[in-house]
Amino acid sequence: NLKVLAVFVLCAILVVVTAERRGTETGGYKKDTLEDLKKRTHDCFDSFKEATCHMAKTNRLCKTSAKYQINCKKTCGLC
């Protein structure tokens, strides 16, 4: 009985904490879009390793993958 109560309390805390989180880094309630992330990235650098970004550019993933568009901006020529 005590274990069930403890699990219930922990789940309730998790629900409350998750509900209080805001949807975006800027503090709004809407979800960030890819365009929002691109606009907020002012510096031109690659977050991923050089070889990873080079592979993404070689395989033309810079145009199709949001992951590489954000993390390989310099190599992909997006800034």
Curated annotation (Swiss-Prot):
Upper classification of the organism: Eukaryota, Metazoa, Cnidaria, Anthozoa, Hexacorallia
Function: Inhibits voltage-gated potassium channels (Kv1/KCNA).
Stored PROSITE patterns: SHKT
Gene Ontology CC terms, in alphabetical order: extracellular region; nematocyst
Subcellular location, record wording: Secreted; Nematocyst
Signal sequence, start to end: 1-19
Keyword Kinase attached: no
Similarity section: Belongs to the sea anemone type 1 potassium channel toxin family. Type 1b subfamily.
S-S bridge residues: C44-C79, C53-C72, C62-C76
Any one GO MF annotation of this record: potassium channel regulator activity
Domain ShKT, first and last residues per copy: 44-79
Keyword check for Disulfide bond: yes
Propeptide regions on this chain: 20-37
Chief location of this protein within or outside the cell: secreted
Entry keyword set: Disulfide bond, Ion channel impairing toxin, Nematocyst, Neurotoxin, Potassium channel impairing toxin, Secreted, Signal, Toxin, Voltage-gated potassium channel impairing toxin
Spans annotated as Crucial for binding to potassium channels: 67-68
Protein's recorded name: U-actitoxin-Avd9d
